[in-house]
Curated annotation (Swiss-Prot):
Lineage: Bacteria, Pseudomonadati, Pseudomonadota, Betaproteobacteria, Neisseriales
Annotated function: One of the early assembly proteins it binds 23S rRNA. One of the proteins that surrounds the polypeptide exit tunnel on the outside of the ribosome. Forms the main docking site for trigger factor binding to the ribosome.
Subunit structure and binding partners: Part of the 50S ribosomal subunit. Contacts protein L29, and trigger factor when it is bound to the ribosome.
Record GO cellular component, one term: ribosome
Name of this chain's protein: Large ribosomal subunit protein uL23
UniProt xrefs under PANTHER family: 60S RIBOSOMAL PROTEIN L23A
Keywords attached to this entry: Ribonucleoprotein, Ribosomal protein, RNA-binding, rRNA-binding
Gene name, Swiss-Prot/TrEMBL: rplW
């Protein structure tokens, strides 16, 4: 299966910013992203390498099921979320703020 660049640019939705993701970034050189529900690990790896220009060591994914929430008498449901924990090769560093600034200039 060939991966086209248009698909790769859509795979990563948004970086996850939380206490856990910050600790992983500092101690384990891992970045956390929300990704498309049907994204595969090879696609995620290729997308990170293409968009941020870093080498990826491994990708771990987890799908979090959406919670059921009540709005008065109406039952609603939050969407399922797929997260990817991307481990970078030693010596590689990913600065999301610099990457976002560079993307804004284009």
């Amino acid at each position: 299966m060939g991966m086209n660049q248009q698909r790769l640019t859509q795979v990563i939705l948004v970086p996850v910013v939380s206490e856990k993701s910050n600790v992983l970034a500092e101690k384990c050189n891992q970045m956390t992203f929300k990704v498309l529900a049907n994204a595969t690990k090879p696609e995620i790896k290729a997308a990170v390498e293409l968009l941020f220009g870093v080498q990826v060591a491994s990708v771990t994914t987890v799908t979090t099921k959406g919670k059921t929430k009540r709005f008065g008498r109406i039952l609603g449901r939050r969407s399922d979320v797929k997260k990817a924990y991307v481990s970078l090769v030693d010596g590689q560093e990913l600065d999301l703020e610099a990457a976002a600034a560079a993307a804004d200039k284009e």
